């Protein structure tokens, strides 16, 4: 949620930010209109309350003086004022709900360093690491390799759950688990993150804090009986962990890592990446979240990206880092870097991590603040999030980049202590 004061004081700036995102800026005029009406209603209500209080004092005085007729007239006026005040209070509540809803629908303001563009074609490549492998044989896609070994099963997954699910057996199941443990070990032992075990079902309020609601409810799985949502990413419970709290500056930054399955309906992705494991309704991910201060959050974002890159470097998988343009930014993000791994089956780089600074966008929704060391004043924290990394896509990248002419796949050296085997199958 962006600051209503910013909209009041500099509406043209906010409108231009929305235009850069490809969003309709008309919502800002609607917000200003409702905000003005809401504030005028509050003023009128307070004036009537003041008049009613004055009447109460005068009634007591008049009765004491024996002027009962005048007192009765004021009592009647007080009753009329009470009815007006009640109606205004209802109007005030209704306007505040409308205002809050519209504010929740406004995306974050892009940072000045974000390239301006309409869509992903105008994202800017920042750097590359490694070179895509040149095969001296025709490489197979992961959706051919896994089933050929009998270790990746899409048909039984479909029988169990429908499309966009996968069953894995034996060495592939162990490789998935090895990747999770490897990533958690790197981030906790080398990068200083605190591992957190979080719920996979969260309240409506929680998932509103992190920005999925109210705008993207159709993308989420909802357990309607209890009004709990399956998390689309561990960012949700991690970023909302300190909602309603005041932290001390000396505690910051807080760096959290969590492994969870993630659940997404993918309602808007019909026809995209229909083969294999690239776009699933359920997938594993190791998530990184920082809670930090405004003055260092963009510096911290650079470190977060490097932490995610380390995983791919240790796995020796070629990748590139891309700065997303304004038109491709996520709803909550002020700045995002995507890390894209090379996949031979696509002959292209595909996203395996997305790292964002959402500034105080989530902190305002969740009332997450810290006390400044310098003057004791309270300020909203900044939150960062990033995949560290998507486990299923890492497995896919290993299968496709490490395959050998005989149809087997060599396990990356750093994973062998976790898997207990060097070759698949």
Curated annotation (Swiss-Prot):
Binding site for ATP: 264-266, 351-354
GO terms under cellular component: cytoplasm
Gene Ontology biological process: selenocysteine biosynthetic process; seryl-tRNA aminoacylation
Reactions listed under catalytic activity: tRNA(Ser) + L-serine + ATP = L-seryl-tRNA(Ser) + AMP + diphosphate + H(+); tRNA(Sec) + L-serine + ATP = L-seryl-tRNA(Sec) + AMP + diphosphate + H(+)
CDD domains registered for this protein in UniProt: SerRS_core
Keywords, alphabetical: Aminoacyl-tRNA synthetase, ATP-binding, Cytoplasm, Ligase, Nucleotide-binding, Protein biosynthesis
GO molecular function: ATP binding; serine-tRNA ligase activity
Compartment(s): Cytoplasm
EC number(s) stated in the UniProt entry for this protein: 6.1.1.11
Origin: domain of life: Bacteria
Enzyme class: ligase
Pathway it works in: Aminoacyl-tRNA biosynthesis; selenocysteinyl-tRNA(Sec) biosynthesis; L-seryl-tRNA(Sec) from L-serine and tRNA(Sec): step 1/1
Coiled coil ranges: none
Main location, first listed in the record: cytoplasm
Record-listed L-serine binding positions: 233-235, 287, 387
Domain comment, as recorded: Consists of two distinct domains, a catalytic core and a N-terminal extension that is involved in tRNA binding.
Purpose: Catalyzes the attachment of serine to tRNA(Ser). Is also able to aminoacylate tRNA(Sec) with serine, to form the misacylated tRNA L-seryl-tRNA(Sec), which will be further converted into selenocysteinyl-tRNA(Sec).
Subunit relationships: Homodimer. The tRNA molecule binds across the dimer.
Family, similarity comment: Belongs to the class-II aminoacyl-tRNA synthetase family. Type-1 seryl-tRNA synthetase subfamily.
Protein name, entry field: Serine--tRNA ligase
Gene: serS
């Amino acid at each position: 949620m962006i600051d209503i004061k910013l909209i009041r004081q500099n509406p043209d700036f906010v409108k231009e930010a929305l235009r850069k995102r490809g969003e309709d800026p008309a919502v800002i005029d609607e917000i200003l209109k409702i905000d003005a009406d809401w504030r005028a209603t509050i003023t009128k209500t307070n004036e009537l309350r003041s008049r009613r209080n004055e009447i109460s004092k005068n009634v007591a005085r008049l009765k004491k003086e024996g002027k009962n007729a005048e007192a009765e007239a004021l009592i009647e006026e007080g009753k009329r004022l009470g009815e007006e005040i009640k109606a205004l209070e209802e109007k005030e509540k209704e306007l505040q709900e409308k205002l809050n809803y519209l504010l929740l629908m406004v995306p974050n303001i892009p940072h000045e360093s974000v390239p301006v563009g309409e869509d992903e074609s105008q994202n800017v490549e920042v750097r590359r690491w490694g070179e895509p492998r040149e095969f001296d044989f025709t490489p197979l896609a992961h959706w051919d390799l896994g089933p050929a070994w009998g270790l990746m099963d899409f048909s039984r997954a479909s029988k169990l759950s429908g499309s966009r699910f996968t069953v894995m057996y034996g060495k592939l199941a162990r490789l998935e688990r090895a990747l999770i443990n490897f990533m958690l070990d790197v981030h906790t032992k080398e990068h200083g993150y605190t591992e957190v075990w979080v719920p996979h079902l969260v309240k409506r309020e929680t998932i509103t804090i992190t920005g999925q609601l109210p705008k993207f409810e159709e993308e989420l799985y909802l357990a309607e009986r209890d009004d709990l949502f399956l998390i689309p990413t561990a960012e949700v419970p991690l970023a909302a962990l300190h909602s309603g709290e005041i932290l001390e500056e000396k505690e910051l930054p807080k760096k959290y890592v969590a492994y969870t399955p993630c659940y997404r309906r993918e309602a808007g992705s019909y026809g995209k990446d229909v083969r294999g494991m690239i776009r699933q309704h359920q997938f594993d991910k190791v998530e990184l979240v920082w809670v930090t201060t405004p003055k260092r959050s963009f510096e911290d974002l650079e470190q977060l990206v490097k932490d995610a890159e380390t995983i791919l470097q240790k796995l020796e998988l070629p990748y590139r880092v891309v700065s997303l343009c304004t038109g491709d930014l996520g709803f909550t993000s002020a700045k995002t870097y995507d890390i894209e791994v090379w996949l031979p089956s696509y002959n292209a780089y595909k996203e395996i991590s997305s790292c964002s600074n959402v500034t105080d966008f989530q902190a305002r929704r969740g009332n997450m603040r810290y006390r400044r060391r310098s003057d004791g004043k309270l300020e909203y924290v900044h939150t960062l999030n990033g995949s560290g990394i998507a486990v299923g896509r890492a497995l896919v990248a290993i299968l496709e980049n490490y395959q050998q002419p005989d149809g087997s796949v060599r396990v990356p050296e750093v994973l062998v202590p976790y898997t207990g085997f060097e070759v698949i199958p």
